[in-house]
C-alpha cells in the first residue's frame, strides 16, 4: 500500500537501524503509545525480529518514507468483529510529524479495510494527544465515547477517546473523502 509520500510494507531485518533511530528510541513517540522505548541497538535488533514475526500473521506494517526508503513509523489494523475494524496503532518518528503522513497512513488503513469488506472503522487516542485527535477528525471520524484505561507501563489512569467512521465503498475499493 502506498501514497505519493509513504509506503506501508512488511518489516525486514535491515530496517532495524532506521526504525530504531526514527521511532523506537524516541520517548516523544512512545508517550501516547503502549510500548516502551528501546534502549540500545542490540534491543532494536531483537525487536525487529519480533516485529517481523508479528507482522507475518497480523495486518501490521512499517511506514517507509518513499523519498529516503527509511522506516519512519508503523501502523496496523485488526478486525474486531465481522466487517468492523480498529486501528492497532499509528506511530511516526518526530522528524516526520506535521508532513501529512499521518493522514495518508490513516486513509490507507481505511481503504485497506474497505477492500476486505469493512463497514465500520474505529480509531482510539489518548485524550491528551491533540495531534492524534485532530488526525481522526480530519479523516472524517467522529467521537463516540471515552473510557478510563490504566497505562501498563506506569500504572497511571488515562482517558481513551474512541472515534468511528462508517466505511463507504465506491465500487473501486476507494473511500469517498
Go through each PLM region and give its residues.
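Acyl-donor (CoA/ACP) binding surface of acyl/acetyltransferases
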Residues: 1-18, 22-28, 62-177
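Hydrophobic residues in alpha-helical segments
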Residues: 23-24, 33, 52-55
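Conserved GNAT-fold acetyl-CoA-binding loop/helix
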Residues: 28-50
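A short helix-loop-beta-strand connector motif used in the catalytic cores of GNAT acetyltransferases and
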Residues: 49-62
Amino acid at each position: 500500500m502506498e501514497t505519493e509520500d509513504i509506503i506501508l510494507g512488511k518489516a525486514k531485518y535491515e530496517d532495524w537501524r532506521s526504525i530504531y533511530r526514527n521511532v523506537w528510541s524516541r520517548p516523544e513517540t512512545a508517550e501516547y503509545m503502549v510500548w516502551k522505548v528501546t534502549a540500545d541497538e542490540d534491543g532494536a535488533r531483537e525487536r525487529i525480529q519480533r516485529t517481523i514475526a508479528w507482522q507475518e500473521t497480523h495486518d501490521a506494517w512499517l511506514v517507509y518514507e518513499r523519498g529516503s526508503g527509511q522506516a519512519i513509523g508503523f501502523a496496523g489494523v485488526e478486525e474486531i468483529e465481522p466487517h468492523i475494524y480498529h486501528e492497532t496503532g499509528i506511530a511516526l518518528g518526530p522528524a516526520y510529524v506535521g508532513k501529512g503522513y499521518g493522514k495518508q497512513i490513516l486513509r490507507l488503513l481505511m481503504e485497506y479495510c474497505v477492500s476486505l469488506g469493512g463497514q465500520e472503522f474505529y480509531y482510539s487516542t489518548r485524550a491528551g494527544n491533540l495531534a492524534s485527535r485532530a488526525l481522526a477528525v480530519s479523516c472524517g471520524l467522529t467521537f463516540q465515547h471515552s473510557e478510563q484505561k490504566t497505562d501498563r507501563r506506569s500504572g497511571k489512569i488515562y482517558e481513551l477517546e474512541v472515534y468511528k467512521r462508517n466505511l463507504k465503498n465506491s465500487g473501486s475499493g476507494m473511500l469517498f473523502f
